[in-house]
Amino acid sequence: MAKTSARSIKPGELNLKEKLVHINRTAKVVKGGKRFGFNAIIVVGDKEGHVGYGLGKANEVQDAIAKGVEDGKKNVIKVPIVKGTIPHQIIAKYGSAKVLMKPATPGTGLIAGGAVRAVLEMAGIHDVLTKSLGSSNPHNVVKAAIKGLQSMSDAYEVGERRSKSLKEVFES
């Protein structure tokens, strides 16, 4: 698997935008009643091949979103994009959430729902077919999509791993 370390990407140098995927209200029962808290899952990306996600928890919605954005900026990965789509088909699993992603021809558009759509939009992928299988929990679906994008490798990386030129990779 071709994994780009998050340490090599400096989020301060990127023009990152954020997208809110899901807000969840939690309640803690105390002696005087219920105390509410919020958690927010946020996807950040520059729409040019960099994407990350973050989880923020706080007593107020705005604070949870701000914490999620900061967390997302710490988890940015590089995604290989070939002509506006992904280099190859992949099935990624996280928990009981499974995400299938297939490359599509230019003009197809982004065929994805909810959490996967947010991840792919922020990564800058325009043409892809996806199907979310298993759990629909947005936390696990986002993590599965990120895991799938992180494990992708383009032809250059394959050639580098095999110590072959690009021409030799396509001949074998």
From Swiss-Prot:
Superkingdom of origin organism: Bacteria
UniProt gene name: rpsE
Protein name, UniProt field: Small ribosomal subunit protein uS5
Stretches assigned to the S5 DRBM domain: 16-79
Notes on the domains: The N-terminal domain interacts with the head of the 30S subunit; the C-terminal domain interacts with the body and contacts protein S4. The interaction surface between S4 and S5 is involved in control of translational fidelity.
The protein's role, per its UniProt record: With S4 and S12 plays an important role in translational accuracy.
Keywords: Ribonucleoprotein, Ribosomal protein, RNA-binding, rRNA-binding
Pfam families: Ribosomal_S5, Ribosomal_S5_C
Record PROSITE patterns: RIBOSOMAL_S5, S5_DSRBD
Transmembrane helix found in the keyword field: no
GO cellular component terms given for this protein: small ribosomal subunit
Gene3D superfamilies, per database record: 3.30.160.20, 3.30.230.10
Molecular function (Gene Ontology), one example: rRNA binding
Family matches, as InterPro entries: Ribosomal_Su5_D2-typ_SF (IPR020568), Ribosomal_uS5 (IPR000851), Ribosomal_uS5_bac-type (IPR005712), Ribosomal_uS5_C (IPR005324), Ribosomal_uS5_N (IPR013810), Ribosomal_uS5_N_CS (IPR018192), Ribsml_uS5_D2-typ_fold_subgr (IPR014721)
Organism (species): Chlorobium phaeobacteroides (strain DSM 266 / SMG 266 / 2430)
Subunit structure: Part of the 30S ribosomal subunit. Contacts proteins S4 and S8.
Family: Belongs to the universal ribosomal protein uS5 family.
One annotated GO biological process: translation
